[in-house]
Amino acid sequence: MSQSTHRSPVYARNGIVAASQPLAVSAGIEILTKGGSAGDAAIATSAVLAVVEPGASHLGGDAFVISHNAARKKNLAFNGSGEAAHSASADQFKNEIDHHGYKSATVPGLVSTWFEIHKEFGLLSMDQILAPAIDYARNGFAANSGFVKRISGHLKMFPDTQVFKSLGFDTNLKVGDLVVQSELADSLEAIAQDGRDAFYLGEIARKLVEASDGWFSLRDLAEHRTRVLPPLSVKYRDYLIHGQPPPSQGMILLEELLIAEGFDLAKMQEADRIHLMVEAKKIAFADRYLLLGDPEHIDINLEELFASSSITARRSQINMDRANLKEPSVSSEGSDTTYFLVADRDGNALSWIQSVFHGFGASWVIPGTGILLNNRLTGFSLDPKSPNFIAPGKRPAHTLNAWSVTREDGSLAYMGGTPGANIQVQSNFQLIVNAIDLKLNPQENAEAPRWQHLNKAGGSSLDEKYEGVLQVENRVEKEILQSLKEKGHSVEELSAYGHGSAVQLLEVLPNGTYIAGSDPRCEGHAAGI
């Protein structure tokens, strides 16, 4: 595997931020330099991303976070996903759930997550933390090429410009033009001053209920909460891998790793290693199809799934000479998302992913607030046999997942993630193997050629299982691609950096030094203090 890089790793001792947008990185660093904690800086980064990357995440979206408290060697999973409105049920839809409009949304969970993080880590006031986001919304920021491309790309698929008018955007925006969002600034100021209640009990909640014709109720907003739980944790080599519990598909990442642990990946030829990992992915995705849903509504036996006997049985299905094109024997689309990480001078760190699901989510803005809603309700199934069947108050299965890695002594070793719908767990699988087995540094890892196995070329679905196309960046040697084809994979070449991920990665040395890497496939970077 080539280890040449476009960028150098970033080394720091007193704090680090890595994100997909430079202004968000600057906001996080600003909060750290003012004495804020990793949690404070993460909230600031999150809020700025909602302002400057609204197509990927917003106050009307969701968040999942894995945190590490260095002093207590404590890891937590924050599940900031929203529930279906109590008016939402399968009989409200014919053949599919609406993709746009308020009926495509779940209760937003991001703002609630901010305040749970602040409870756990907060040192500065929310006025101080949200000040950078309020400034960019009130006084404007210069549109970069990614911002302009995201708007034009959305308009090519959906010519209706109403969502952009509601956000206050000029659809003829050019790179360098100033983007001002006065209504969003007002909403952020209300949240900074009045706290969580401003969103879930106050004027914002009332405006959502009124504009949605009662689809959402005040009860839906008032009853929402971010769940704070122990993460799922499994041993891989000499490390503990921490992932998101259901309804996140973080369990699939852990299953992939457990299957792969039975093989010496470091000594494998690259074609064999890719083949093995793709086959492990197929098995794990088949399990997801049968098991993944909201654990508050269905039973999910993860102890059984992760048991050594279950993993051994799944591992035995892998033929190292031939791709499995049939359904694995298991027990009974592109997405718009943003990932970032933050660590502080005390060794505390957060791995954070937030999203409105598809590009610009529901394409519907709560009137008078500047807040864009998610379209995460489309993550449900209308099949009554599915564990992910839609129901009032239920959370849909989520592609969103964040992860961290600790050593046997409990200290943080790695943290990372990426957006990308079903690509997420596949990319994260590769990142962890590259770090632990292949010993790549974070920047080498972020830039390394990647693959993705999808149910169809360019496609992504929560029903995805085992069939599909293996897409590989064309920096991989031709002999490797040919070997994969000979094993039976349907291989398609992506451009050199054409994989749909935007990775941010952190390594923490035993002496506490931070090393961060940022993906050249996106416009962000890493910065330290």
Regions found by a protein language model. Name each.
Residues 346, 394, 428-429, 437-497:
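Extended C-terminal subregions enriched in glycine
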Residues 57-58, 62-69, 338-342, 402-404, ...:
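Short beta-strand scaffold segments in enzyme catalytic cores
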Residues 51-68, 72-76, 216-217, 348-414, ...:
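Active-site rim segments in enzyme catalytic domains, especially the processed small/beta chain
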Residues 242-250, 337-341, 353-364, 417-425, ...:
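Glycine-rich phosphate/pyrophosphate-binding beta-alpha loops
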Residues 264-356, 369, 376, 495:
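Internal maturation/activation junctions in enzymes
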Residues 228, 334-337, 398-400:
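Short, small/polar residue-rich loop motifs at catalytic or cofactor-binding pockets
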Residues 1-26, 30, 36-248, 306, ...:
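Noncatalytic scaffold domains of N-terminal-nucleophile
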